[in-house]
Amino acid sequence: MKNLKTIGWVGSLGTLITILAFSGSGFRNQLPEPVIEKSGLIRNEGNFYYRDLNKNGKLDVYEDPRQPIENRIQDLLKQMNLEEKAGMMFYSPTRVNKDGTIEEEPAKDFLATMSPVGVTEMDKRHISHFNLFSVPEPDTLAIWYNRMQKHAEKGRLGIPITIASDPRNQDAGGFFNMSAKTFSIWPDPLGLAAIGDAKLMEEFANISRQEYLAVGIRQALHPQVDLATEPRWPRIAGTFGEDATLSAKMTTAYIKGYQGEKISEKSVAMMTKHFPGGGPQKEGLDPHFAFQKGQVYPGNNFKYHLIPFEAAFKSQTAAIMPYYGVPMGQKDYEEVGFSYNKSIVTSLLRNKYHYDGVVCTDWGLVSDAKIGNLDFPARAWGVEKLNKEERVQRIIEAGVDQLGGENLPEIIVQLVKDGRLSEHRIDESVVRLLRLKFELGLFENPFIDEKKAGEIVGKAEFMKAGQDAMRRSITLLKNDNHALPLATNKLKIFVKGINPKVAAEYGMVVTDPKQADIAIIRLKTPSYPIPETKGNPIAGFFHFGDLDFKGKELDDILALEKTVPTVVDIYLDRAAVIPEISQNAKALLANYGASDAALLDVVFGKYKPGGHLPIELPSSMEAVRNQKEDVPYDTKDPLYKFGFGLSY
């Protein structure tokens, strides 16, 4: 083969770049520096530089970025064996060693017990999709990521890995958010919806995209576009509220900010969830657990919950994740979990909406899990009697491409060998999965610049943008006699739920409310243990139960309000029921994840509140119990209506 040479990693980086740029007279392409530095497979054919992923000494179609993606997919598909195809169809959790190494070591924490080591999964099961839970600092994560890609490069076909994550830019304590750590911190998605500004939503997504790319996260297990039509549901904070039009608007901007106009090497691919809408949960319980398998539609409002997904389809979301729930009382849909449900995945999603992107299940539909000493049964609702092989077969026959939180490719291999699934059906899913990897540019440049990770993640301008959004999202619900804004450094203030050191920058902090001119307190929407969660510590992480304050907790709040004029701020991760607190407060504000400084900047007039309620606040628990789980803003005589918000 003419002018074929392998370029080893020898000498300085500058020398290597010079070799690549100027060797031969017909230079045509320049490889990105991370590939130059990290890849051991760079070759030159006719002065065209590429990665010889299958190590056969020649330029294959799938290795050639000049070729159409569909041609590259078909070339690679022909070279893959059944085991490699099956491995593509699983999204396995993985853990990151704190020192950035990729070698297997004993699990040391709660989340690590759920997460096998990535290199083991690559070597034994050909898995190339991994999602992260807890992670180390950005620079360490970047080192780990490059080492993982380097290991993937050594595989028979050199197929790069894809790393995914749940949201990492909120830190309000939501169970479904990964800790922001050094990532820029923003209000919950509910707070961004309270602002309602599509340009700001796109800005947030673009900033988060840059941070994700800096550490190698190429797929986001969000946005969550469920409609918050049931006030008691624990997952409201991750939504854009209960209004379908607002949610669709936010969804469009969100996807554009992460993916761009089309998916490219600069994109983070979206996995929009939870199709066909996870909001209408009976009494606000959640189908993560066996005590609540079915979604209910007493208002016959199934189609309303599809509206945000229609916006996601128009925005070309890379992937869709169905929820765990079972559609109850819907004549067109079988009463089995959505990912097991061919009428949902094939008839509705594939055929009606002509969606040809990736469909990935929510996590843990096939295998029972053991988390520490806790048993966590598979969410195989409606098909509990099926064994693992039958569950996997049922999911794939429903039209799903990928199984989240599982690592069972050997089952797919056996199903094909037994004639229960065709390899052609497996190929359909693998084509979609490969297409996304190619579109993301992972076959050309899977590596990142480790030196830039710490510079990009959480940089000052990103942090400032997040703090500004927190301030802007704060929603003023009551301002008796224009009590707000308060005068800075002129008042004695009593605070509760606020760091006194932060408060001291705004006034003289006193410990006795009777000596204060004003009290400022921060509350969180209540939650209570329910009988169904008894003996289930995992369910205890979910905020279930009534939405109103009770007993001594309520008495103490009301007593304070009667002792001193009180400014009340409440964090809304669900729709709080606070009529007595509102009535007695001098001023009332709502937040959706905001720092003490962001709140006090608004209270003391450095910034104006700009939020409007993305969910209504009911006036009583009776009204909550009487509303219909699938219908928006339908509680009787709400205390504060959807869209309400004051300013000054």
Which residues are covered by each model-predicted region?
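N-terminal beta-rich core of secreted/periplasmic extracellular enzymes
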Residues: 30-276, 306-321, 335-408, 421-442, ...
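Short acidic, glycine/serine/threonine-rich loops at helix termini
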Residues: 172-179, 231-236, 280-287, 331-334, ...
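Short glycine/threonine-rich loop-to-helix capping motif typified by GTGT followed
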Residues: 237-239, 331-342, 460, 499-505, ...
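Binuclear metal-dependent hydrolase catalytic cores centered on His/Asp/Glu-rich metal-binding motifs
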Residues: 275, 282-302
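Phosphate/pyrophosphate-binding active-site segments
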Residues: 443-444, 448-449
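C-terminal non-catalytic regions of proteins with extracellular/luminal or membrane-system context
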Residues: 2-7, 16-47, 53, 112-115, ...
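Short beta-alpha connecting loops at secondary-structure transitions
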Residues: 235, 290-297, 330-335, 369-400, ...
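Extended catalytic-interface subdomain
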Residues: 323-329
